[in-house]
Amino acid sequence: MNQIERREFLKSAGLFTLAAAAAPHALAEAPAMSDATRVTLKGHLATVENHLHNGIIPFWFARALDTQYGGFVTNFDEQGKALPCPEKYVNTQCRLIWWFSTLKRRFPEMPKTAEMASQGVDFLIKNFWDQKYGGFAWKVKRDGSELDPAKIVYGESFCIYALSEYYLATGDKRGLEYASRTFDLLQKYAADTQNGGYYENVNRDWSPEAGGFAGGDRKGLDTHMHLMESFTTLYKASGDDLHRRKLLQVIGLIKEEMTDKATGCGLNQFDLAFSSLPAIPIKRTWNGERLGEKPADPVDTTSYGHNVELEYLMHLALKTANQEGDADRAIYRRLLDHAVKHGVDWEYGGIYRDGLRATGEAIVKEKEFWQHSESLVAFLDGYEQFHEPRYLEAFGKIWQFVQDFMIIKGVGEWRTLLDRQGKPIDPNIGNPWKVSYHTGRSMVECRERLMRLLA
């Protein structure tokens, strides 16, 4: 019995989901809001809106466009000054397409959003699309000439995500066409029909990469979580039942194979059959490019940032698929509760990078931009659903740290990496991996949740 057959058996026996054994967590009825809580929420909304409209949005409008070659430049120092940008990565080109597209959707009267997104799509299709094998290359030189034609499923997922959002924002049929073609290629070449899930690192012709640092023999929560994210937006754009079914398959896989049954936390890396492995840096990843090859993390390591990001992305995915139930809400609460108890730094503010699942002990206490971005959304998402005061307190503790130490006043973006007490380790605010996807999306999503809470 292979992995897929095993999951179908478990499903038929009523044993499939991790949350089946957990106590149901129905949505709580909203209690009457106190005057003090309303004042707190109004204060948070004011600071979020101010940073969004006077910081992040103008920062990227002023700097992202590559006026020489098209597409986007991504590299900026602490003061927002452009740094050399010799390469363009598909994930950050797509994240900026997504950013300007989502601004078009959320703020329809905002000028030039569609134009910025459209020229990004022009550059993406012209320079990244592989005319021979299909799919999008991992990176090109700044002028669009070939550099690394490999197919990285993490990158392909952001192509689907961005192009689907672009279609929803503009109606440009190229968006849905290329998002759907990329999805189809993943099903044809990257889907693991024996074990489930997707191969993550493949060559230009879709043949498997080598193992080890090349990553061809591993699967990870990060990539599959972003496939869930991209399939959610693709299904919104297409309404195609195949897209919905593949979305639900990824969600089921994450719940059954990629989360720890004892704690509810996410597991980081696996072999192809989903046995958990000590996590190693892999080339063409954020950690791999920063750290290179290094000793593996303990197998018990969990990412607080990925856990909370998983909470609200899964919540959105299941709502979009109209498939959410009380057992799923139990999963959300376990992810949030572990992060509140162990990941939030209640002394200095912010949220730690990594910890141990079983004990919850934080083992990497540096403060990185993306975990803070995602935890802000997730804790508001949890507060909106469950009205748990501790979630709102966690939001406030993290948001204050971000305002005090990460956001660069007068510039408008966030430093990349700080120590526990807020001292900069990497003060630059734009790089081939860091644009407005985490920080900008955080402010957009927080704004909408705060407005609903105050309605």
Q: How would you name each of these model-derived features?
A:
Residues L27-A455:
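Glycan-recognition and catalytic cores of secretory/periplasmic carbohydrate-active enzymes
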Residues M1-T17:
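N-terminal secretory signal peptides and thylakoid transit peptides that target proteins
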